[in-house]
């Protein structure tokens, strides 16, 4: 059964993201004093008292939505309200009830969705609570909280889960978590939207439009995926604003909590030094990786074939040469359906377990075909080996002396494992441990 969705809405800077982070117990949304910092819908699963639901943080609703970005944020809020079973309408207890709040309340009443009025920034519960004005909204009894201090959050969550239908939190298999990383404006958000078939992530020609690592839940054929769309990573020297700084950290953290990375390149730019750095982060994090060359529709008439360009990309990213390279267009949809199929293939390799007998046969053959060079009169000897991890696969080789392993021979063994077993799109870790021969 699908988990219920709870959407947090309200005008800018009332503390929606602070409440979102408080409920999650970690900083998932960028929090800043600048109004409108959260622009996209952020999705996270919450477990409260054994009940599970999806919490959605949205951008602030602007009553004077003259700017294009404000209109886009408003559209994101509208979509979140459409898919939510419950809405948390957050207001500022310090500012009191404003005309914008009344206008938003009217919008919520028209939605016919259940609403909990959450009065935030109530930092002192020993004084009379400033709630009288908020009853005027006609949306029920206000719930006072302090998201910053964590006051009354438990009572709020009790109210949230109280109205959920029985069985709504049945456990399901874990979704595949996919980090979408790349330089600013290579089309990461457009690509996610093309896969999803709807605009969940704000798309703009302005680099850096996506500020948060935006978690988007997606289902296909009974399989769940979570796309983590990060702000584009810029060169370190360019990072001056705190929001850009946090976005770079968020991209790295997104890789840490993902299973697989889509490293997005821009066909019109070729492979840049920054692309190499970002691909390197995915490799260092030990994630399954797919290289996605976006804007391939612009290759038409250029005389460049997909196979030739893919080889060029592999040469430029030779350190991650095991990663599949897909040429797609988020605008036209060209090649986009292949992405999830490739994700499934790579995830199968990422979680693959090799029988110990097969692994020993492969590596013993590798030692026989090309024996390791002697060093200081000693030669590396393999006793036996075993797989010690998946995601990514890691193999532990028990040898007479790990100090005899050269970087070149380690690469040779990895290549032999790949030649025999594949592991397309997946880093392979070869580890060594001393064991004296009997």
From Swiss-Prot:
Residues 352-436 form the KH-like domain. Keywords: GTP-binding, Nucleotide-binding, Repeat, Ribosome biogenesis. InterPro entries: AAA+_ATPase, G_ENGA, GTP-bd, GTPase_Der, KH_dom-like, KH_dom-like_a/b, P-loop_NTPase, Small_GTP-bd. One of its GO terms (biological process) is ribosome biogenesis. Disulfide bonds: none annotated. GTP 1 binds at residues 10-17, 57-61, 120-123. Residues 4-168, 176-351 form the EngA-type G domain. CDD domains: EngA1, EngA2. One of its GO terms (molecular function) is GTP binding. It holds the Pfam family MMR_HSR1. GTP 2 binds at residues 182-189, 229-233, 294-297. PANTHER family: GTPASE DER (PTHR43834:SF6). GTPase that plays an essential role in the late steps of ribosome biogenesis. Belongs to the TRAFAC class TrmE-Era-EngA-EngB-Septin-like GTPase superfamily. EngA (Der) GTPase family. Associates with the 50S ribosomal subunit. This is GTPase Der. It comes from Desulforudis audaxviator (strain MP104C).
């Amino acid at each position: 059964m699908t988990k219920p969705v709870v959407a947090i809405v309200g005008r800018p800077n009332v503390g929606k993201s602070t409440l979102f982070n408080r409920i999650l117990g970690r900083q998932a949304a960028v929090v800043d004093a600048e109004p409108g910092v959260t622009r996209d819908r952020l999705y996270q699963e919450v477990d409260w008292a054994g009940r599970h639901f999806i919490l959605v943080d949205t951008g602030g609703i602007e009553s004077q939505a003259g700017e294009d970005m404000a209109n886009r944020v408003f559209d994101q809020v509208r979509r979140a309200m459409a898919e939510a079973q419950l809405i948390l309408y957050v207001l500022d207890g310090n500012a009191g009830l404003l005309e914008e709040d009344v206008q938003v309340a009217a919008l919520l009443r028209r939605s016919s969705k259940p609403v909990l009025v959450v009065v935030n920034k109530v930092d002192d519960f020993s004084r009379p609570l400033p709630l009288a004005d908020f009853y005027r909204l006609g949306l029920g009894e206000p719930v006072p909280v302090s998201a910053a201090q964590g006051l009354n959050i438990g009572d709020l969550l009790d109210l949230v889960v109280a109205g959920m239908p029985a069985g709504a939190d049945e456990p399901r298999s874990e979704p595949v978590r996919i980090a979408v990383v790349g330089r600013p404006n290579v089309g990461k958000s457009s690509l996610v939207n093309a896969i999803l078939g709807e605009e969940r992530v704000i798309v703009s020609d302005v680099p850096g439009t996506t500020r948060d690592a935006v978690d988007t839940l997606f289902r296909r054929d009974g399989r769940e995926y979570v796309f983590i769309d990060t702000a584009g990573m810029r060169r370190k020297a360019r990072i001056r604003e705190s929001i850009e700084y946090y976005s770079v950290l968020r991209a790295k953290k997104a890789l840490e909590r993902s299973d697989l990375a889509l490293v997005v390149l821009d066909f019109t730019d070729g492979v840049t030094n920054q692309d190499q750095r970002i691909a390197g982060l995915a490799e260092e994090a030990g994630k399954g990786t797919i290289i996605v060359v976006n804007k391939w529709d612009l290759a038409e008439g250029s005389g460049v074939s997909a196979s030739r360009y893919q080889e060029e990309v592999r040469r430029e990213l030779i350190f991650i040469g095991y990663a599949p390279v897909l040429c797609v267009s988020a605008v036209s949809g060209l090649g986009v359906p292949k992405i999830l199929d490739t994700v499934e293939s790579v995830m199968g390799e990422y979680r693959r377990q090799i029988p110990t007998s097969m692994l020993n046969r492969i590596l013993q053959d590798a030692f026989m075909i090309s024996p390791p060079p002697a060093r200081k009169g000693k030669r590396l000897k393999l006793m036996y080996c075993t797989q010690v991890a998946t995601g990514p696969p890691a193999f532990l080789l028990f040898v007479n002396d790990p100090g005899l392993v050269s970087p070149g021979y380690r690469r040779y063994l990895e290549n032999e494992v790949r030649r025999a077993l594949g592991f397309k799109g997946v880093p392979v870790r070869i580890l060594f441990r001393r064991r004296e021969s009997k």
